[in-house]
């Protein structure tokens, strides 16, 4: 079951009353896990550009939509390689500042996964 996101503030995100003080990924089955930022940092030296390797890690077969919370000020971007990959696997991507992305997430229906950056 898809967890509801209650709130986000700089440095944290709250799901179903539980606060996480790190970036998260939400899987198709509703499982919440810590984002593997090192997959992008290894390529770009920052976690603000999502690499192809990270996009492949995030994507799950069956996901039709990916909601990305790009941070409180919206600094996270997809690399061109990551964008091309997600287009190839027919996964619609929505990049929104995290406060807006949580609203989109909570209203989302169907096969949706999420990545939420909690700073910047």
Which residues does each predicted region cover?
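N-terminal, charge-rich interaction modules
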Residues: 1-41
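Flexible, charged surface loops at secondary-structure boundaries
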Residues: 18-20, 58-62, 107-110
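Short beta-strand segments
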Residues: 27, 69, 115-119
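Compact, glycine-rich, soluble single-domain proteins
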Residues: 33-58
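Short active-site-adjacent helix-start/loop capping segments
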Residues: 35, 74-78, 104
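Mid-chain, well-packed structural core segment of small domains
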Residues: 58-94
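A short glycine-rich beta-strand->turn/loop micro-motif centered on a GG-aromatic cluster
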Residues: 92-102
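Short basic, glycine-rich beta-strand/loop surfaces that mediate nucleic-acid
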Residues: 102-120
